[in-house]
């Protein structure tokens, strides 16, 4: 049982929701009434999101979601935070609950074989297994599994094209895929199976469940796991990390990254310095100045974030 005041719930469920638009307002009202913040995505294919609040508030929300007709029990990962990791609550209507951009991909019809965390090490240690990180390059940069391939994608939409261009690396192998909480792998494995690959596996519950259940001394995970909230990243046991965001480009920064000559808080980092003009950096510097002034006054500290 954590002593930290905020419970963070990452959840998803693929299920036919033909009337998903009607679910938006009741969810938004429940979250607002109970002080819950974060993002929930609704689409005809299901629900996805990460939210935070008191333990009791999150319990109410999960009960509400589970009771939605046709939805059932969502895939859930819990962690905890010392501060509220979101600034506001958003319930959005989308075409997909995780955007791959490939028509006809349905994890309810075809998906890879789930591998629970305790069995994951044996699979990825097998010399006939190719391990694929389905996340984006900035996520891979701060942590991944031993021997994992980095597809070097900036968005999940780019992943299908990477697979097509790298079929020769996957042929005749066991294909083990992983992502943060499992949802991207639902579609990634469905897509790969649709190309004719049979030995396709994915980590059930994603990296978050692995870090929660597998002891550090047995772990094959190196680094931190990027999360899409103000905690930025978590480590073994889902402990908060010392990784921060570059507020100019939103890349994750380790303490080592902040030693770069190109790092200036709120203005630039080694990853984005060359991508920005002097005018951009001057604008970011002024924004950072306003952030610091707001913090001194005790105002919101997420200006421009």
Curated annotation (Swiss-Prot):
Residues 125-219 form the Rhodanese domain. The keyword ATP-binding does not apply. This is tRNA uridine(34) hydroxylase. The keyword Cell membrane does not apply. PROSITE patterns: RHODANESE_3 (PS50206). It comes from the Bacteria. The active site is at residue 179. One of its GO terms (biological process) is tRNA modification. Belongs to the TrhO family. Catalyzes oxygen-dependent 5-hydroxyuridine (ho5U) modification at position 34 in tRNAs. GO terms for molecular function: oxidoreductase activity, acting on paired donors, with incorporation or reduction of molecular oxygen. It catalyses: uridine(34) in tRNA + AH2 + O2 = 5-hydroxyuridine(34) in tRNA + A + H2O. InterPro entries: Rhodanese-like_dom, Rhodanese-like_dom_sf, TrhO, TRHO_N. It is an enzyme of class 1 (oxidoreductase). Keywords: Oxidoreductase, tRNA processing. The lineage of its organism: Bacteria, Pseudomonadati, Pseudomonadota, Alphaproteobacteria, Hyphomicrobiales. Its EC number is 1.14.-.-.
